[in-house]
């Protein structure tokens, strides 16, 4: 908490602190990352509504977005992305925004260093151990960029350039009576 207070003073921010024991609640779960993200977002929405707010802003950046795209492709077999802005389905009149959506992680780190800002590491045990799927995706993207310059940008660009005529679910094939799912 000392780093949070340091940054608060440095940036002259008026903040309110709220504590939750979400990490304890998801420890030992089969899919702790997904559950933790849902619980943290729910806690933020609840507190925002309680304070009379209509938006929550999350710090997801460009690198988070492309890591999420790859995780969805590789682990869930679906093409989807995290949106920069969306309306909550569970909290009426609430909206989620991601103002850093197009900002690279390295640029955020440079900004923090230049302005002598210090941020706390995630308290998540999976992140601390460096064993989570997001870390693996980060490593994969770095490897792809070593071999294919701009691979990270093209992953993001693919979200804008979806050709629906080449997506199997959008075409009715006479010779396929039921969808084929590879297992």
Task: Label the predicted regions.
Residues 1-70, 75-78, 83, 106-114, ...:
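ATP-dependent adenylation/nucleotidyltransferase module used to activate substrates
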Residues 21-26, 49-56, 90-99, 108-110, ...:
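Low-complexity, flexible helical/coil segments
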Residues 29, 33, 37, 59, ...:
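Alpha-helix initiation/capping motif
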Residues 39-51, 85-91, 140-159:
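Short, basic, helix/turn surface patches
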Residues 63-136, 140-143:
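Catalytic subdomain that performs nucleotidyl-dependent activation
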Residues 117-183:
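The feature marks non-catalytic terminal segments
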């Amino acid at each position: 908490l000392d780093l949070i207070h340091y940054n608060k003073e440095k940036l002259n921010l008026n903040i309110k602190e709220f504590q939750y024991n979400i990490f304890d609640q998801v420890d030992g779960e089969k899919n702790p990352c997904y559950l933790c993200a849902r619980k943290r977002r729910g806690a933020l929405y609840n507190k925002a509504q309680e304070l009379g707010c209509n938006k929550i802003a999350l710090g997801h950046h460009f690198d988070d977005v492309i890591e999420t795209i790859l995780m969805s492709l590789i682990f869930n077999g679906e093409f989807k992305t995290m949106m920069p802005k969306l309306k909550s389905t569970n909290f009426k009149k609430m909206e989620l925004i991601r103002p850093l959506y197009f900002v690279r992680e390295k640029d955020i780190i440079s900004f923090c260093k230049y302005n002598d800002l210090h941020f706390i590491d995630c308290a998540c045990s999976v992140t601390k151990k460096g064993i989570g799927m997001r870390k693996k995706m980060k490593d994969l993207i770095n490897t792809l960029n070593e071999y294919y310059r701009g691979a990270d940008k093209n992953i993001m660009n693919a979200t804008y350039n979806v050709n629906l005529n080449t997506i199997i679910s959008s075409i009715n094939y006479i010779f396929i009576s039921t969808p084929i799912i590879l297992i």
